[in-house]
């Protein structure tokens, strides 16, 4: 009864979301319009806290106006692309707002990129200028001869700390700005919902990074719904945002959401678990935009005084795994965890509107879960050649129907966009976006009949062993439950003479010499079915992740258990044993000669 009464209270937040209409194509709905509206209402309230700086909405708007005028007077037009290569700081937000005010497109580059990937992202965007933070000038300088921007006037350098000097190939942007420009630009009145606000690049884990197209309508709609039904914040709140603004989580779920209601943002260059709670208290951050790995880092820290009675009430993000969820919510006394699911280039948003546990929530889009053969990496079809839907709670490939209410903007690369579309799925002529993710339905109790879902794994990350499907995420959750394991990365590796892939896990240890392999082996045996137990364990020094803390698997998968190639210690389960032991050259030779008995 208590849950039923609570759910009735959720209706007042759910109904506006269900009734929400996306902005019309020619409507003046954009990031810059939202920002100017919040500036008009809350101009003297804080916009951004950063290190020793505090910017009000009014101050940031003046700087953005001046920057926009500078760009316009130097040839940047509506629809032009401009690279933004800078770490999280106020000038990142100001730069993006300035571009949006004149209808230009921000090309948001991952700040960890160097060399060929950096060259690819810049050249594929056909940008006319590059805004570069002083802190990222060195990797840009190293590729200057290989990119398609060459004039000194086209490199706008934004100073950072005193340790960086202005390079001879760029101009000092701030020296050309008027920080008292109160007049909004006329060009902003021509910026509409259909105009592209920015390009956000994929992580490149399945090839070279691809630029996902984000129109203003998507930014505005996401920010509106997330603040209205997710965070439930207003202009008096402050959001903790340490996620990179070049990524959709930090940008759309973080900065854009705060702008939508005139809230403040505490932004950081990088996440720090050791200073998190002290900063949350200092800036009274009532909201937190997260990804799951950050939450895992926080619960792995010893309890502190700073975490007690912390100000965080609601958090919105993605990737919080079930094995972390309950512990995090209870230990830090968080009222609302609103898990989100949706790709930058995708056409659907799942949201845990009802604040249920361990779910990505529901969606208003038309979706289906398809039967999928993990071993053959293919969608199963019926005798008529159409796809087959999952009819129970088993994982299936999530697809989203493409239509007027679920537009697929895709990538700038049309060929790459087409590869993400499935056609003639259930009938001739239909079209669906292929998420590439395995999802399952879950029972969350009373939810007004709304189906709820849970993320399982990426297609390609799930592997097959002993005629069973093995989810890397689910195995990783179990391994992470062992007290001494630091964030296990699970993947499948080929074993000579065996069908499918054997499980392998990589993780670091605080105390390698003191690690109890017998106890750990018993834990694995008691908590995982035999087919899901990792055959190989690689002990690494530090986990390699993307800029948004996604675990990198490709290199680990390629290295496999080849101890002649890697310096790390590798342990294994032999077919006749349940105890992990050190893999040596003799046993490796037996594996490679198909004599090990796997």
Predicted regions and their residues:
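Structural core segment of the AMP-binding/adenylate-forming
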Residues: 1, 6, 73-74, 97, ...
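Conserved AMP-binding/adenylate-forming core of the ANL superfamily
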Residues: 23-28, 44-89, 93-97, 114-119, ...
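Conserved pre-ATP/AMP-binding loop-to-beta segment of ANL
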Residues: 44, 157, 178-201, 208, ...
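Conserved AMP-binding A3 loop
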Residues: 56-58, 190, 197-221
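AMP-binding/adenylate-forming catalytic core of the ANL superfamily
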Residues: 113-116, 120, 130-132, 342, ...
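Conserved adenylate-forming
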Residues: 115-116, 144-166, 260-264, 268-408, ...
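Conserved AMP-binding/adenylation subdomain of ANL enzymes
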Residues: 220-238, 246-286, 301
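AMP-binding/adenylate-forming catalytic domain of the ANL superfamily
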Residues: 528-551, 567-595
